[in-house]
A protein has these predicted regions:
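Electropositive, gly/pro-rich neighborhoods at or near active sites that engage anionic ligands
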Residues: 1-129
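A general structural motif
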Residues: 129-131, 157
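Short, basic, glycine/proline-bearing loop/turn elements
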Residues: 106-108, 133-135, 191-198
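Redox- and metal-dependent alpha/beta enzyme cores, enriched for Fe-S-associated oxidoreductases
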Residues: 144-202
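A short, acidic, amphipathic alpha-helical segment used as a generic capping/interface helix at domain edges
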Residues: 201-216
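Short, well-ordered alpha-helix to beta-strand connector turns
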Residues: 129, 186-187, 214-216
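Short, glycine-rich nucleotide/cofactor-binding loops
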Residues: 131-143
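Conserved mixed alpha/beta catalytic, RNA-binding, or beta-rich assembly cores of soluble enzyme
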Residues: 96-98, 112, 127, 140, ...
Length: 216
């Protein structure tokens, strides 16, 4: 029965002309929105990955003490926090719904180097900034974002604003979820204002308030 339902979902997801190469003016977020609407229809709600997101956050929270300890013991706590924030992206449920970020995999953060070449420049700019806007992404990963923001707090007195989703889409964290995870203790939480389940962040579709903040 589950296999039959999955086939039915996939048939409907792949049925639009846009999924068959009939339209080339659409972006990946546009296609995701079409597929997401099908999943929501079959699930009977607008957040079919809610339980999975909660599980990803739980797994990340279990790792948080280990990560904080590694960050605090590092010779460069800011750089270490950046590494873990990048590694946390491996919690993306769209890649793997069964496993989370294991402690062993978290330790791989220490091996990141080439992708962190600009961390020193980033740190300098953060120290000079008066306002920092931090766009969140996936559930689970957001816990490591919080640890990075905690480090930002230690090196900068800038106003720190965290932007999360207004509406659920895939496994991205919503503003209400970010609040429940305690991110409001380290940053002001704002909704992105996008009134459709659009993956990614299209600035032109965010609220005027967010657009004005980015352009300041």
């Amino acid at each position: 029965q589950d296999v039959d339902q999955l086939r039915a979902i996939m048939r409907k997801v792949l049925s639009p002309t846009s999924m068959k190469g009939g339209r080339w003016d659409l972006t990946a977020p546009d296609l995701v929105e079409e597929a997401w609407s099908v999943l929501c229809e079959f699930a009977g709600n607008n957040d079919p990955l809610k339980d999975i997101k909660a599980d990803q956050n739980r797994k990340a929270l279990e790792l948080a003490p280990y990560v904080r300890k590694a960050v605090m013991q590092s010779n460069n706590s800011f750089l270490e926090a950046v590494k873990f924030a990048i590694t946390g992206n491996q919690l993306d449920v769209m890649l793997d719904t069964k496993t989370g970020l294991k402690k062993e995999r978290a330790s791989e953060a220490a091996m990141l180097d080439a992708s962190i070449n600009n961390a020193n420049e980033l740190e300098k700019r953060i120290k000079k900034a008066h306002k920092i806007i931090y766009f969140t992404d996936n559930s689970g990963e957001v816990i490591f974002d919080r640890i990075l923001m905690e480090q930002i707090r230690t090196i900068s007195s800038a106003e720190l604003i965290l932007v999360a989703r207004t509406l659920p889409i895939l496994n991205d964290v919503t503003a209400s979820e970010a609040q429940s995870l305690g991110l409001g203790y380290v940053a002001k939480i704002m909704e992105n204002g996008i009134q459709e389940p659009l993956a990614g962040t299209t600035l032109s579709k965010t609220s005027k308030e967010i657009q004005d903040l980015v352009r300041e």
